[in-house]
Amino acid sequence: MPCVGLIVNDGKELAVETALTLQSRLEQAGIEVVRASSSGGMVGFANPDQHLRLLGYNACVPEGFDASMALAIVLGGDGTVLSAARQTAPVQVPILTINTGHLGFLAEAYLADLDRVIEQVLNKQWTIEERCTLVVSVLRGDQCRWEALSLNEMALHREPLTSMCHFEVAIGRHAPVDISADGVILSTPTGSTAYALSAGGPVITPECPVLQLAPIAPHSLASRALVFSDQEPVTVFPATADRLMMVVDGSAGCYVWPEDRVLIRRSDHPVRFVRLADHEFFQVLRNKLGWGLPHVAKPDRP
């Protein structure tokens, strides 16, 4: 019997109701359904100065999810998709995203498309698009103190009421660079339309094999975002006396202390997105972020 996963944002009533409808219709068609909550992918915030439960990113995989699963349907907003990515990438289960949230930048379908979605799932009418992920590790000496998988970005920044930060960033074999800013963002192409975009970074199309380093509020006219090969590991050394906050995809993170370093590298586990139709990235940019809309001149004031 084919098996399909359901990953649901249990905090959204609409997502829960839709999950019940989907599960009923899939089971009537002879499909086994394994349901999980998206909260399982929300690692939360941890303090490396205290005892840390380091389980590795494989620990987020829900019970019953494995490589034999045909796909997992994700019900929620973009935050739910980021959590689901962390839950499914280690076992390479493809995800079909249905938006029940707000922006839905990562959504493949909407509730109005539900009948079509079910039909295409049952008839196996879909393709797979892979998106790269990152492994983000906090290291102290030879010890890994914290680790998580990231689809969008890692952001390392100062706490409130503290001074501007200084970072030494080593990219692969290249000479380290010094950055003075409120923080730094290391993003994938998928994450280039998220926090990195707000920090002034460029939009990167998903198929480009690159990563992006973007400073947050840099205190320099010459400090700009940098795009480089995703084959290069990145190490960020805090050059500041204050502890810093690190947040990964908005739902995981920890404190980083002056004696720590953050290692970011491309993961061997991409997120596999189910596509029901040709995915036109520039159309998504236009519809969701207003990119390329024609300029309409404002009338002169009387």
Swiss-Prot record:
It catalyses: NAD(+) + ATP = ADP + NADP(+) + H(+). GO terms for molecular function: ATP binding; metal ion binding; NAD binding; NAD+ kinase activity. It comes from the Bacteria. The active site is at D78 (proton acceptor). Its main location: cytoplasm. The keyword Methyltransferase does not apply. Coiled coil: none annotated. NAD(+) binds at D78, G79, N152, E153, D182, T193, A194, Y195, A196, L197, S198, A217. InterPro entries: ATP-NAD_kinase_N, ATP-NAD_kinase_PpnK-typ_C, NAD/diacylglycerol_kinase_sf, NADK. One of its GO terms (biological process) is NAD metabolic process. Its cofactor is a divalent metal cation. Keywords: ATP-binding, Cytoplasm, Kinase, NAD, NADP, Nucleotide-binding, Transferase. The keyword Kinase applies. Pfam families: NAD_kinase, NAD_kinase_C. It is found in: Cytoplasm. Involved in the regulation of the intracellular balance of NAD and NADP, and is a key enzyme in the biosynthesis of NADP. Catalyzes specifically the phosphorylation on 2'-hydroxyl of the adenosine moiety of NAD to yield NADP. This is NAD kinase 2. It comes from Prochlorococcus marinus (strain MIT 9313). The gene is nadK2.
